[in-house]
């Protein structure tokens, strides 16, 4: 729950919702439109940060521009790792406890941690991302945005959620 609270403040608000709302206000959007925009973008902002956490462990460094596994070496406490910890057995938890936050992790140790995350947390993490994506689309469907605006916001969703960097 704490990890999701961090996601809410870090990404949903600061990285997605607030900048988009400010942009909409600057272009003269109504209060109703900015309220609708927040309802649509908040779950997509959550999904954006969760995708970022996945890319921090599994992303292609040639695409992301950062070393895959840095989040593990830095010991970032992400929702993906919280899910992994919940499902991990005692042996896997010991490996996670030893490896997370260890900047000296070898590539083999890093791969072992990735395998644990993939086995124990990644599937559920993807389900949560899909749930947030669907919540945003439900909000979009019930909004007063016109067809062109909905299409544009759907493209924004893809950029936020279906990204590889």
Predicted regions and their residues:
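All-alpha prenyltransferase/terpene-synthase fold signal
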Residues: 1-165
